[in-house]
Amino acid sequence: MTRLLPRWFVERIAPVRDEDELPVSTLELFFDLIFVFTVAQFTAIIAHDPAEGLLQTVLMFGFLWWMYAGYSWLTNVIPPVRPARRILLLCAMAGWLVVALTIPAAFESGSVWIAIGMLVVVLVHGLMYLQAARAFGPVFVANLAAVAAVFAAELGPAGAWRYGFWALAAAIVWSVPVWHGQRGLNLHPAHITERHGLVVIVALGESVVAIGIGARGLPVDADLLVAAVLGLAIGACLWWSLFVRDLPGTEHALKATTDQVKRVRKVLAGLSYAFIPVLVGILVFAAGLKHAVGHALSPLDFESALLLSGGVAAFMLGTAGLRWSMRLPRPWERVALAAAVLAVAPLGLVNTALQLAAVVVVLVGALALEGRASAAPRPAPAE
């Protein structure tokens, strides 16, 4: 497919060696700021209607996360060091902004603009990859097919039709690793790990924003301060659970995996697939926190209590998937931790602060036990 592109556009990209530094650029950080807005839109949808909003979020997030993670892979393989690449990334940011702006309308009135935004995102992504990777052609076609499904969803009637085509879009892109294989990519372990970690940091920022939004117009009293501080404590525990041991262990495991195909498979399983419950869990928790702020001394409704505990539990299940994929120690401990966090959800029906405090106690206790059991992750076997 690179033969269809002008010669001046196609270039040979030399992969960066594992031992050489490939820091995340400021342009990539700027690019990630769009994700802040995207996360905020999904959080608002879930907070407004937990059941239907969560279904809509999962369907849209399936396709959007595939493409967003795709840009992390893109800048890993083709660093944005030339002006042309930087301009293309900025054009992609415009597409992502259009997508984020139109997320609330996607399942309500329908908006062809979200499909147009995704088309821009996919075209820029594909053209940049095709500069250097001819094998990307079939993936590009699959991404375009997913965009076509989004056009069909937004131009068709509301209801089952729209849900069905969004599900089809997600199914198309996530089937790619099954039939295309994982050859032709050389991923830099430190960069790909840091890039995905930064996306989680951005998403965790939404939980802090949720505190501010929930507190808007409320008096600064014990109700507000207790819920805010406990909510921040939970966010801190989520950060600790991923960044203190698991992500450093992930980078080490990827460096130890010298076979590039096996490395790509680990990144797919651990940083792409497993990060879906990690990120959606943060969105769900933030939506529940919006309802909790300002009502710490009152009971929560069932849906809000489930959002608070369910979001944290989903996050922990995602970290279990990461540990399993990277062969890090004790993934099943995180499954047990997710169950324990869910078990305290009924406390919110009695008192909001009681549930928040119970979640904090469960998380801190589990993380303390993990820290005592292993001060550092065991090295993954070289492959």
For each predicted feature, which ranges?
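Predominantly late transmembrane helices and immediately cytosolic-facing juxtamembrane segments
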Residues: 1-25, 29, 34, 48, ...
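Loop-to-transmembrane alpha-helix initiation sites
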Residues: 160-165, 351-361
